[in-house]
Design a protein with these regions (language model features):
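Transmembrane beta-barrel domains of outer membrane proteins
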Residues: 77-79, 112-114, 160-164, 174, ...
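Outer-membrane beta-barrel "beta-signal"
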Residues: 212-213, 357-362, 367, 382-393
Length: 393
C-alpha cells in the first residue's frame, strides 16, 4: 500500500502545465572556455573552427574538497551522435576517477548511448572502488552518534538495453552485478552497529546479481545539459541472491522534467522525483537504498553521501538555471531538495530532510552545452561541495 502511494505521488508530481520548450541549439554569439583558450594561442582575428563535428570532448582535472574529504577528481566527458542529429539523440560517455585524502579510489565509467534514429538505447555503469565511507545506521532517525566507518572494495557492471517502441517510449532489460570484497568496519560507538546487527556480524565477500525490466521515456534533445523535455525511467529488479540466501527485489523510478522560459537566454526550471525501494528478501547492507547512491550518484546535494540509508528512499528536487552573461559563458543555479528514508523494515516516510544551495556555471564546451559545475549545498548539520561537467540531473 505504501509503495502504491509513493507511485501516485510521483505521477501527480509531473502532471503540471508545460511551458514552451526550447531546442538545445548553440548560437554563434555563445562563448566557452575553449574559445578563451583559442584566443590566447591564436591571432586575435582568427575564428575557431571545427564546430560542425559530431563529437565533442571535455576534460577537467581539479582538486576538490567534496563532502568533507579533500581529493582530486578528473572528469572526462565526450558526447557524440551515431546518426542524423535531427533524428538521433545525443550519446555521452563519462569517466570521472576520484582520489581522496581519506583513501578513497573510484574509477567509474558511465555510458548513455543512442544508436541511429534512436532504435536502441544502452545505459551502462561500470566501476571499481576502494571506498572507506562513514555510515550512520539504518532508518530515518540515524545521527552522527551512530557513525562508523565501513571499508570495502566494489566491482560493478550494470548494462541496460532498451528498444524503441513508439515515439519516445522504450522498453528492455538490464543485467546488474555488484561484488563487495574485503569488508571491514571501524566503530565509534559502544555496542553493535546497525551494519553488524543487520548482517549478523558477517563481513565476508558478497556478490549481488540481478535481472531488471526497464521502461523508459526520454524526450530530451541534450542529456548533458537539458533545456526541455522529460525523462522517466522505471526499473524492476529481480535479484538471484541475498543475505542468508534470501532473494530480493527492488523498484527504481527516476522522473525528471525541464521547462524553458526563454528562446534567447538559458532560463530553465528543472525538477526531479526519485523513488528506490527493496522488498521480498534481504539485500546486502550496501545494496540498500541510500542518499547519494542513485546510479548517477547525484542525489542529496547538501548531505554527505551515504548519510541516510534504509529499505526505501523518496527524494524530490527542484532547480532554476540561468545565464549571468549574455554570451552564456557565466551562469548560476539555485536548488532545493527534500528526502526521506523509511523507518527501517517499513515504508513509513515520517522524517524529512531538506537542503538548499546554489552553484556557479562556466560554459566549458558549447558544442555539447557542457558546463564547469560547482555546487554548494547546506542542510541541518551537514553540507556538500560538488564539481563536474554535466548538470546534476
Amino acid at each position: 500500500m505504501k509503495n502504491t502511494k509513493c507511485l501516485i505521488v510521483l505521477f501527480f508530481f509531473f502532471l503540471m502545465p508545460f511551458c514552451y520548450s526550447q531546442t538545445d541549439s548553440i548560437t554563434n554569439n555563445k562563448r566557452d572556455i575553449l574559445d578563451v583558450l583559442y584566443k590566447l594561442f591564436h591571432k586575435n582575428d582568427s575564428v575557431r573552427t571545427g564546430m560542425d563535428k559530431k563529437i565533442a570532448f571535455s576534460l577537467l582535472p581539479v582538486p576538490i574538497n567534496a563532502d568533507k574529504s579533500g581529493g582530486l577528481v578528473v572528469s572526462f566527458l565526450t558526447s557524440f551522435y551515431l546518426g542524423d542529429e535531427k533524428t538521433t539523440n545525443m550519446s555521452q560517455i563519462t569517466f570521472s576517477p576520484y582520489f581522496s585524502f581519506t583513501n578513497q579510489y573510484v574509477f567509474p565509467i558511465q555510458t548513455y548511448i543512442y544508436t541511429k534514429d534512436n532504435h536502441w538505447n544502452f545505459i551502462g555503469d561500470y566501476r571499481f572502488m576502494i571506498y572507506p565511507q562513514d555510515t550512520y545506521g539504518l532508518g530515518g532517525n540515524n545521527t552522527a552518534d551512530e557513525m562508523s566507518t565501513l571499508d570495502y572494495q566494489q566491482w560493478r557492471f550494470y548494462q541496460f538495453a532498451t528498444r524503441k517502441i513508439v515515439g519516445n517510449y522504450r522498453a528492455g532489460l538490464g543485467l546488474l552485478y555488484d561484488n563487495y570484497q574485503n569488508i571491514s568496519e571501524e566503530s565509534f560507538i559502544d555496542g553493535e552497529t546497525d551494519y553488524y546487527k543487520y548482517m549478523n556480524g558477517d563481513f565476508s565477500n558478497e556478490t549481488s546479481f540481478g535481472v531488471a525490466f526497464q521502461g523508459l521515456y526520454d524526450s530530451r534533445e541534450n542529456n548533458v545539459n537539458p533545456e526541455q523535455g522529460m525523462y522517466i525511467e522505471a526499473d524492476y529488479r529481480i535479484n538471484t541472491s541475498g543475505v542468508e540466501g534470501k532473494k530480493w527485489n527492488s523498484i527504481y523510478i527516476d522522473a525528471r522534467k525541464y521547462h524553458s522560459f526563454s528562446k534567447q537566454r538559458h532560463k530553465v526550471l528543472a525538477y526531479r522525483a526519485f523513488y528506490w525501494s527493496t522488498f521480498g528478501g534481504k539485500p546486502h547492507y550496501l545494496d540498500l537504498p541510500s542518499i547519494g547512491w542513485d546510479r548517477d550518484g547525484k542525489t542529496g546535494r547538501g548531505f554527505t553521501r551515504n548519510r541516510f540509508r534504509s529499505n526505501a528512499l523518496l527524494y524530490f528536487e527542484g532547480e532554476y538555471r540561468m545565464d549571468i552573461s549574455k554570451n552564456g559563458f557565466w551562469g548560476a543555479v539555485f536548488f532545493t531538495n527534500i528526502s526521506s528514508v523509511s523507518k527501517f523494515d517499513t515504508y513509513d516516510f515520517s522524517k524529512w530532510n531538506p537542503a538548499v544551495g546554489t552553484g556557479l556555471r562556466i560554459k566549458f564546451n558549447k558544442k555539447n552545452n557542457s558546463n564547469l559545475v560547482l555546487d554548494y549545498g547546506i542542510s541541518k548539520n551537514d553540507w556538500s561541495l560538488r564539481l563536474g561537467l554535466s548538470e546534476n540531473f
